[in-house]
Amino acid sequence: MQAVNIPDWYIQSCERVQYLFPKAHAVAYVLMAYRIAYCKVHHPKHFYASYFTVRATDFDYTHVSKGSHYIKNFIKSVYQQGFRASVQDKSIATYLELANEMIERGYEFEKVDLYKSHPTKFLITEKGLRPPLASLAGVGNNAALSIAEARDVNNPFISREDLRQRAGIGKAVIERLADVGVLDDLPESNQIDLF
């Protein structure tokens, strides 16, 4: 290294530390942090939609649908448990912190909708974000994709039974969708009551 005029201090540092964090690598981290912060401040709905779609793999709509008070209490209880808290609860608390921040900034999570929700991505709406079908616990990506393929605005589902048959999903998924109110407008079966 001395043959190519590397300073002595650098050679000694390499001998002591064995590895120095490259400046270019550090700059790349800083630039990325700056870009993320810029998006969070100037394009908040896009930031939150991207974050929840990509990072929050454990996202469960039922947690955010219960409101800000529930979210704060859940986060508080996880922190109070400390090391005793489960890994899943810690993961949920992480995305709930960001969900709470989003709500505090005046945006909201709209209701999951059978026809308007994307199967796997958060959609930007006028009020905030619309969670995907897969954000419901018990409704996996495959079931959400099957529902998206089966739905047709020109030929809406006439019943829960019709949804189950056309999408090829099980009763458990139907029950999960019904539990959170996604199927409130759909009758149980294709049969029509005359009296």
Question: Which residue ranges define each predicted feature?
Answer:
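Noncatalytic, beta-rich nucleic-acid-contacting surfaces in large DNA/RNA-processing enzymes
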Residues: 1-195
